[in-house]
């Protein structure tokens, strides 16, 4: 089905973008945009998608931290600790990704992960990474607990989902060691 409309969608997407450029920067630059696309000076990813609808998205996580998933149609309130943050974050990314074909970028993820680690384990948690913080059957150090939560998030993002045609989420994260 989608292939039938590909050529028309490309034309529509280019027209929508040309109109926006014209409104912002004038007719000359708008015309140059089309010329540059047609002569392959510019590349625009997946122009054949739904006209006027973005392929990828970068989100701010602040509304999620204040309202949870309620405003996205979910029932989860705002996360209160590291465990609820990681679990709800996974649901957030899957909820957003079901509305876009491309990647979901969450540039604030590590910053808020750090916030909830600090909330649960103290501002000086980096000084106590080797402390045992879980006394269940396996005694776990703080570094292992943090690693497990991070793995939970990453592994969950790699699970195929029905709302994405049984594909995994295309998730962008910046991680610097």
Could you tell me what each predicted segment is?
Residues 1-177:
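Catalytic alpha/beta active-site cores
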């Amino acid at each position: 089905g989608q292939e039938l409309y590909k050529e028309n969608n490309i034309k529509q997407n280019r027209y929508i973008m040309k109109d926006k450029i014209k409104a912002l920067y004038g007719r000359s630059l708008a015309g140059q945009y089309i010329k540059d696309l047609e002569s392959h000076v510019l590349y625009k990813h997946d122009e054949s998608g739904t006209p006027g609808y973005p392929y990828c998205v970068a989100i701010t996580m602040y509304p999620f931290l204040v309202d949870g998933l309620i405003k996205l149609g979910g029932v989860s309130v705002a996360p209160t600790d590291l465990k609820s943050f990681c679990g709800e974050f996974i649901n957030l990314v899957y909820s957003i990704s079901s509305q876009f074909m491309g990647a979901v970028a969450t540039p604030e993820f590590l910053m808020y992960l750090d916030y909830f680690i600090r909330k649960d384990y103290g501002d000086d948690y980096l000084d106590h990474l080797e402390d045992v913080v879980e006394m269940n059957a396996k005694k776990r150090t703080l570094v292992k607990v943090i690693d497990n939560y991070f793995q939970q998030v990453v592994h969950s993002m790699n699970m195929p989902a029905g709302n994405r045609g049984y594909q995994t989420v295309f998730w962008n994260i910046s991680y610097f060691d």
